[in-house]
């Protein structure tokens, strides 16, 4: 099954949300196509 975000329990496929899916706790922006599993910088969506 899909991995889930530690912060809100949503599937990591919801890149629009600031999910703590990475071990480093970095958020995953939906625009990240090179590294879909992790962002290279913090990304917050209000």
Curated annotation (Swiss-Prot):
The record's InterPro entries line, in alphabetical order, gives: Conotoxin-I_CS (IPR013141), Toxin_19 (IPR012624)
Modifications the protein undergoes after translation, according to the UniProt entry? The natural D-Phe form of the peptide is more potent than the synthetic L-Phe form.
Chief localization: secreted
Q: Which residues carry this modification: 4-hydroxyproline?
A: 2, 11, 29
Q: Name one GO cellular component term.
A: extracellular region
Q: Where in the cell is it found?
A: Secreted
Which organs or tissues contain this protein?
Expressed by the venom duct.
**UniProt keywords, alphabetically:** D-amino acid, Disulfide bond, Hydroxylation, Ion channel impairing toxin, Neurotoxin, Secreted, Toxin, Voltage-gated sodium channel impairing toxin
Q: What are the disulfide bonds? A: 5-19, 12-22, 18-27, 21-38
Gene3D superfamilies xref list: 4.10.40.80
Q: What single Pfam family name could you report for this chain, choosing any that match?
A: Toxin_19
Q: Which residues carry this modification: D-phenylalanine?
A: 44
Q: GO MF terms on file?
A: sodium channel regulator activity; toxin activity
Please provide the record's free-text comment about the domains of this protein: The cysteine framework is XI (C-C-CC-CC-C-C).
Q: What is the annotated role of this protein in its UniProt record?
A: Iota-conotoxins bind to voltage-gated sodium channels (Nav) and act as agonists by shifting the voltage-dependence of activation to more hyperpolarized levels. Produces excitatory symptoms when injected intracranially into mice and is lethal at higher doses. Exposure to frog cutaneous pectoris induces spontaneous and repetitive action potentials. This effect is slowly reversible. Natural peptide (with D-Phe) is active on nerve, but not on muscle. Synthetic peptide (with L-Phe) is not active on both nerve and muscle.
Which family does the UniProt entry place this protein in? Belongs to the conotoxin I1 superfamily.
State the protein's name. Answer: Iota-conotoxin-like r11b
